[in-house]
Amino acid sequence: MSIDIDWERATSGPDGELLAERIRSFIHDKFQQIVLPRFIRSVQVTSFNFGTIPPELEIRDLSDPFPDFFEDDDENFSDSSEERSPTREPVDRYGNRVDSWQANSPGGPGGQMYGRVGFNQPLRMPEWEEHTGISPLRGPMNFGDINPYLFPRSGTPGIPGGTSNLGYYMPLSGLSNSQTPLGAVARGNPFSGGWPDAHGARPSRRRSEAEPDSAQSRPSTANTGNTLPSRDSMSVSDPHHCHASQGMSNNQGQVLEPNIPPTSPNHPLDDTPPRRMREQKAEDFQVFCRTKYAGNISLSLTAEILLDYPMPSFVGLPLKLNITGLTFDAVAVIAYIRRRIHFCFLSPDDADTLMGPETAAGSGGGDTLEPNSPRRKHSSLLREIRVESEIGRKENGKQALKNVGKLEKFVLEQVRRIFEEEFVYPSFWTFLI
């Protein structure tokens, strides 16, 4: 079933301009956190425009929402409070009042829909994990007053602009490297008898910082739930620990067994609390929607190319890059769970697992890829990005022209990386309505 979108009405007017400015500011902030190559300086995102061509949407399937969408990490916005006092002033997780914002949006009942846009609070880390040096590579999308439930911006040493989880969720079910994030979901109903136990005591998985010298490397995930606490992290007041130490010192030839019960893989030695899951209700549902886009969305960036002749960083040439359009084809997931809408895209592997392999369509021509082909599995959801570059003082010669190509390649890689890390499952966005 196809869906028609009034693209002009949705992206124009004061609300559309405000949303475009928020997206521009978000992309700009992400570029400020990237380690730039030596020959590039001062990347600025100057404008963003939705264009005039709408995407093509086709509903492919309906199902129960993913288990991750039921995780309740918002202490001040519970389901019971939503039903009893829907007009309560929004507060953050520390109890501080935040400004609310309401706007009229088209498409709702009667042509108007009153809603608020926001994001979940960041996941809590256990105390021993806060000292491991692992920091999430997340940056807040600064929606300002448009999002009363925005992540609080937290300053992190060593990362400009601070970091935030930004409604970002890693696969927290302990999957192996050979499985896709949705492999377990495809094998059966996520709400089978064993699902709460599997998610109740599973270790947390977090994303670590990427290598600073590799612009296109993706952060890796590491299972920190089963990691034993270090020797220094044990408190000297622990009776079991003191008993074991005294026994070893008083009997050098004999090692006494400490009075610590044996641990099992199901009970790791950490203080990570189990996830609080919302109860599934009959009205909760999830839509799989095929999304195709080949429009004229535009994004403008400015930067400086440094020339190394006659000395390193001798002069900087201003450069303007214009992304004039892109081609996009993916499966979107939209879940509705009691005044919350969760949104994300599926990777090609996950889309094939849930939706089944698709044959190449004749209308796609040579750009349509078989889902099981190696090229499809390792390609980006952004099939094509069209770029136009303008450089000042072209009389500087080959040195400038050579680095223009490098800069274009660098910018396109970063745009793809930002999109995949922020919008592809297991990352997802939550909107409060």
UniProtKB/Swiss-Prot annotation:
User: Which species expresses this protein natively?
Assistant: Ajellomyces capsulatus (strain NAm1 / WU24)
- Read off the domain note: The SMP-LTD domain is a barrel-like domain that can bind various types of glycerophospholipids in its interior and mediate their transfer between two adjacent bilayers.
Major subcellular site:
mitochondrion
Write out the entry's keywords from A to Z: Endoplasmic reticulum, Lipid transport, Lipid-binding, Membrane, Mitochondrion, Mitochondrion outer membrane, Transport
What InterPro entries does UniProt report for this protein, alphabetically?
Mdm12, MMM1_dom, SMP_LBD
Protein family according to the UniProt entry: Belongs to the MDM12 family.
Q: Which GO terms describe its biological process?
A: mitochondrial genome maintenance; mitochondrion-endoplasmic reticulum membrane tethering; phospholipid transport; protein insertion into mitochondrial outer membrane
Q: What is this protein called?
A: Mitochondrial distribution and morphology protein 12
Q: Spans of biased composition, class Polar residues?
A: 214-236
Quaternary structure annotation from Swiss-Prot or TrEMBL: Component of the ER-mitochondria encounter structure (ERMES) or MDM complex, composed of MMM1, MDM10, MDM12 and MDM34. A MMM1 homodimer associates with one molecule of MDM12 on each side in a pairwise head-to-tail manner, and the SMP-LTD domains of MMM1 and MDM12 generate a continuous hydrophobic tunnel for phospholipid trafficking.
| Nucleotidyltransferase recorded as keyword | no
- Annotated region (Disordered) at 62-113, 180-279, 356-376
Q: Which gene name belongs to this protein?
A: MDM12
